[in-house]
């Protein structure tokens, strides 16, 4: 009887090591896909927020006489409810149009899970207003808290918001 000195085939240890390496590679790929999905979601939210801010800015541009009323209306949550007069189908004053515009834009933002605010921009001397649109755990405010959008003229690193400087 002749005995073999060399091993033939693949041992169980080699197979397990290969499976472990494959599993680590697959986990890396899954993590990469997850980050890509997060980045896509963030981009979609930013585009929607920019569109909402642009919508309000264009409405303000079209109704400059109601400028002071826009900030007042958007800063008061009770004023952001649906406005009873439809200024698209009937004549409205500049103030009523501002009320209507704010209710329309805030309604769009709320439908997307976003909050809005409008305040005088920090760091400028010409009285320009900034439109804040925030989503997620961020509020459309300026401050030093974890949920604030900005601190003065700088975005907070954990915030998810967009600011547009306007009239």
Predicted regions and their residues:
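N-terminal leader/signal peptides at the extreme start of proteins
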Residues: 1-10
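Mobile, glycine-rich extracellular loop/lid and propeptide segments
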Residues: 2, 19, 24, 58-61
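Alpha-helix N-cap/helix-initiation motif
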Residues: 5, 38, 42-45
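Amphipathic alpha-helical recognition patches that constitute DNA-binding helices
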Residues: 11, 48
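C-terminal juxtamembrane segment of a hydrophobic transmembrane alpha-helix
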Residues: 21-41
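Hydrophobic alpha-helical segments, especially transmembrane helices
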Residues: 34-36, 47, 55
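Flexible, low-complexity segments enriched in proline/glycine/serine and punctuated by aromatic residues
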Residues: 41-43, 50-167
């Amino acid at each position: 009887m002749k005995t073999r000195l060399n091993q033939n085939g693949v041992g169980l240890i080699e197979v397990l090591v290969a499976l472990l390496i494959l599993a680590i590679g697959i986990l890396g790929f899954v993590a990469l896909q997850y980050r890509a999905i997060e980045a896509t979601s963030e981009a979609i939210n930013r585009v929607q927020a920019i569109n909402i801010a642009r919508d309000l800015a264009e409405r303000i541009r079209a109704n400059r006489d109601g400028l002071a009323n826009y900030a007042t209306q958007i800063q008061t949550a009770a004023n952001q409810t649906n406005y009873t007069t439809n200024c698209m189908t009937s004549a409205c004053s500049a103030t009523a149009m501002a009320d209507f515009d704010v209710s329309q834009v805030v309604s769009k933002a709320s439908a997307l899970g976003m909050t809005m605010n409008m305040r005088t921009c920090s760091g400028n001397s010409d009285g320009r207003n900034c439109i804040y649109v925030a989503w997620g755990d961020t509020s459309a405010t300026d401050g030093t808290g974890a949920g604030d959008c900005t601190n003065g003229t700088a975005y907070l690193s954990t915030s998810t918001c967009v600011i547009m400087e306007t009239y």
